Amino acid sequence: MIKQYLQVTKPGIIFGNLISVIGGFLLAAQGRIDYPLFLATLVGVSLVVASGCVFNNVIDRDIDKKMERTKNRVLVKGLISLKVTLVYASLLGIAGFALLYVAANPLAMWLAVMGFVVYVGVYSLYMKRHSVYGTLIGSLSGAAPPVIGYCAVSNQFDAGALILLLIFSLWQMPHSYAIAIFRFKDYQAANIPVLPVVKGISVAKNHITLYIVAFAIATLMLSLGGYAGYKYLIVAAAVSVWWLGMALSGYKNAIDDRVWARKLFVFSIVAITSLSVMMSVDSMAPAHEVLLTYLR
């Protein structure tokens, strides 16, 4: 039973978000780490993300039964009652919001609320089922965790927070489109209007390429704005160029789109993890030492 309650929170998504929270937090901390705040932020965001995932499982149970990848999920098989699941999700969310408010600051809590509302209320309940722009809206909620981590320390939404929002939102797009391509039949069967299904895979490839270019520019802004150092800059540039090269390889005539998309998806995880690690490590230089000053 405990395993089922854990599964419904989507632990993989929680773990992925924690990596980005750590990146945002340590970027803002600049080497001066408040460990109680760090722990509280990680736990608070984890609880909020878990709550959102449980609510998403409730909302998507009719869709999940149509998809090969999700047909064996806990709620699809009726292993937990709907009423208990809703109470469980609510308690997780309340605990997460309360912890962020008390242990971090109101800004971090309200950012978590906004991310939660966008994911559950806007994306899951409506946009995912009715609009090709659902992925774009969902990307905003996916970018919330690193911004929460950053603002838990800074207690302000500054240029650094905005750049993080851009980086992680732009990353979500090619990442999500890649999933939709190699899981094309699942999305088609569930009648989910993702771009590859609605507009075709060739159009999706164009969007993927453009979003990766935009992502690359956004990642460089973190160094050029003085929030991360040259080591981060080198890794960001290398990761972006490699990811773009992989995207461009998708235009070859003999390419297997499903295999290509899966590789692109896997590398997207490598890319964002690398950036999260590097912004954590290379943020320990003096705050706001603008890289451009070294180039004059």
Curated annotation (Swiss-Prot):
Q: How does the protein's chain sit in the membrane according to the entry?
A: Multi-pass membrane protein
UniProt name for this protein = Protoheme IX farnesyltransferase
**Record's PANTHER family?**
PROTOHEME IX FARNESYLTRANSFERASE, MITOCHONDRIAL
Question: What is one cellular component GO term in this UniProt entry?
Answer: plasma membrane
Its predominant location is membrane
Q: What does this protein do?
A: Converts heme B (protoheme IX) to heme O by substitution of the vinyl group on carbon 2 of heme B porphyrin ring with a hydroxyethyl farnesyl side group.
- Entries under Pfam families matching the protein: UbiA (PF01040)
Tell me the InterPro entries matching this sequence: Protohaem_IX_farnesylTrfase, UbiA_prenyltransferase, UbiA_prenylTrfase_CS, UbiA_sf
Please name the taxonomic classification of the source: Bacteria, Pseudomonadati, Pseudomonadota, Gammaproteobacteria, Enterobacterales
Localisation: Cell inner membrane
Catalyses:
heme b + (2E,6E)-farnesyl diphosphate + H2O = Fe(II)-heme o + diphosphate
Q: Name one GO biological process term.
A: heme O biosynthetic process
Tell me what organism the protein belongs to: Pectobacterium atrosepticum (strain SCRI 1043 / ATCC BAA-672) (Erwinia carotovora subsp. atroseptica)
